A protein has these predicted regions:
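Consensus "Asn ladder" position of solenoid repeat domains
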Residues: 43, 64, 88, 109-112, ...
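Ankyrin-repeat and related helical/solenoid repeat scaffolds used for protein-protein interactions
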Residues: 139-191
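Leucine-rich repeat
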Residues: 46, 52-56, 66-67, 75-79, 90-91, 99-103, 114-115, 123-128, ...
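LRR N-terminal entry segment and analogous cap-like coil->beta motifs
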Residues: 33-89, 95
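Conserved hydrophobic beta-strand positions in leucine-rich repeat
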Residues: 38, 57-61, 80-85, 104-109, ...
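Membrane-proximal C-terminal cap and juxtamembrane stalk of leucine-rich repeat ectodomains
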Residues: 2-4, 13-26, 32-34, 186-290
Length: 290
């Protein structure tokens, strides 16, 4: 019995060593300072590295040439809390890419070539605290529900992009927001910007550079001015203007009122007709009795 165990010892040691190597395998061209960190910063990668440990928590991929992230990339990395994809060549996020990133706390997508942030992009990233989307020179569109579900988000960076406008609903859906960066965008101070300006006015304490750090182009002459020189009165001509949604509500309300009026008129006419017939019948009965 003991001789068998003695004979198996070298095999067990070899097996254990192999499992340890597999468990903490580090991708080539990357560094792994600890068992839960993979650092592939500045390695000239044109795609995501292979053999990333399944229990990775910090994945550093900045300063490479990675053009896209497969939608199923994060499925196997359920422990990932920190993902840095800054300064790559990303042009868009595949639908569902972040659908399994429920533990992700930090995400950096800055300095890429993103053009838009579609609705529902981060809806499963409920643990996300810091989101960096700045320095995307072609990012001109952020959908109204792009950040829906980010109830824990405290810091949002959208500076130095190509945003000329932003629906204020985007920011109103972030109850935990403490810091928002919007400077360096080509904002246009028209009536579409009015609601966002009022939100920024009320939440100026969340702007690291204050209202002074954000500029917009005046709708009249295109002159760039700091938001700090504007006030609610700067948008007073917008107060009486209706949006497309307002017009649709007015039209729908008008149709409903018209239909209700027709039904009410028909009902009233029917009641009057019945009353007249009943009155005529009673008159005939009274004449017959006489």
């Amino acid at each position: 019995m003991f001789s068998c165990v003695h004979w198996l010892q070298p095999f067990l040691v070899l097996l254990s060593s192999t499992l340890l190597i597999w468990g903490y395998n580090c991708p080539s061209s990357c560094l792994c300072p600890d068992h839960h960190t993979v650092d592939c910063t500045g390695q000239g990668l044109t795609r995501l590295p292979d053999s990333i440990p399944l229990d990775v928590r910090r994945l550093l991929l900045s300063n490479n040439w990675i053009p896209w992230v497969p939608s199923d990339f994060l499925v196997l990395y359920s422990d990932l809390v920190y993902l840095d994809l800054r300064n790559n060549s990303l042009t868009r996020l595949e639908p569902g890419t972040l659908s399994t990133s429920s533990r992700l706390v930090y995400l950096d997508l800055g300095s890429n070539n993103l053009t838009e942030i579609p609705s529902g992009t981060f809806e499963e990233s409920r643990s996300l605290i810091k989101l960096r989307l700045g320095n995307n020179p072609f990012l001109s569109m952020v959908s109204k529900d792009a950040f829906l579900g980010l109830t824990s988000l405290r810091e949002l960076e959208l500076e130095r992009n190509a945003l000329s406008g932003l629906d204020v609903v985007v920011l109103s859906q972030l109850p935990s927001l403490r810091v928002i960066r919007l400077e360096g965008n080509p904002w246009v101070c028209n009536c579409n910007f009015a609601k966002l300006f009022l939100w920024l006015l009320e939440n100026r304490h969340k702007l690291p550079m204050g209202l002074e750090g954000i500029e917009c182009s005046l709708a009249v002459d295109g002159q760039r001015v700091s938001l700090s020189v504007l006030s609610e009165d700067s948008f007073r001509e917008c107060r009486g203007m209706l949006t497309l949604t307002d017009y649709l509500i007015v039209i729908f309300s008008g149709i409903c009122i018209s239909v209700a009026a027709i039904i009410a008129s028909f009902f009233l006419a029917s009641m009057i007709h019945c009353f007249q017939r009943l009155k005529a019948k009673r008159t005939d009965e009274e004449e017959g009795e006489e």
